[in-house]
A protein has these predicted regions:
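Core dinuclear metal-dependent hydrolase active-site scaffold
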Residues: 1-57, 136-145
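Cap/insert and terminal regions of metallo-dependent hydrolase folds
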Residues: 41, 49-138
Length: 145
């Protein structure tokens, strides 16, 4: 994957726009998506190691960034996973650099689930906005634009 990929339009109609960008997931192709509707934007990272700023560009100013949180900070997860997934400290840095309004941590394996306080503290070291852990059927209400 190129260090800086273009943002591509996937869908556009009168009410909604979906864009995507290639993200770093070792040698496995992966993309992140931005969904815009009604004056709001939600970005879903997909699996990524975040070794470049592609997600920062796609997520710029988003209301919500849903971020793959499949590893703990090193050495808390298997070494091979760090070429595929973003450590919590870097997640906080990406969210702050993109100036997102809130962050939802998703794709939570047991190692992350059992270390929520540690993971949250690490994310908050770089990002001061609201942070939530995702759960099935979660609903996020957004204020009127």
């Amino acid at each position: 994957m190129r260090a800086e990929a273009p943002i591509e339009e996937v869908v556009r109609d009168a009410d909604m726009r979906v864009t995507s960008i290639a993200v770093d997931h070792d040698d496995v192709p992966a993309v992140a998506y931005r969904i815009e509707h009604g004056g709001h934007a939600i970005v879903v990272s997909g699996d990524l190691a975040s070794k470049n700023d592609n997600l920062v560009r796609l997520a710029a100013g988003a209301d919500v960034l849903v971020y793959d949180t499949a590893v703990r900070d090193p050495p808390g997860s298997a070494p091979g996973l760090y070429s595929l997934h973003t450590p919590p400290k870097r997640i906080g840095e990406v969210a702050a650099a993109a100036h997102v309004r809130s962050l939802v941590l998703s794709h939570l394996p047991p190692a992350v689930e059992h270390a929520r306080e540690e993971v949250l503290a690490s994310v908050r070291a770089g990002y001061a906005g609201p942070v939530r852990f995702a759960n099935d059927c979660m609903r996020i209400d957004l204020p009127a634009p």
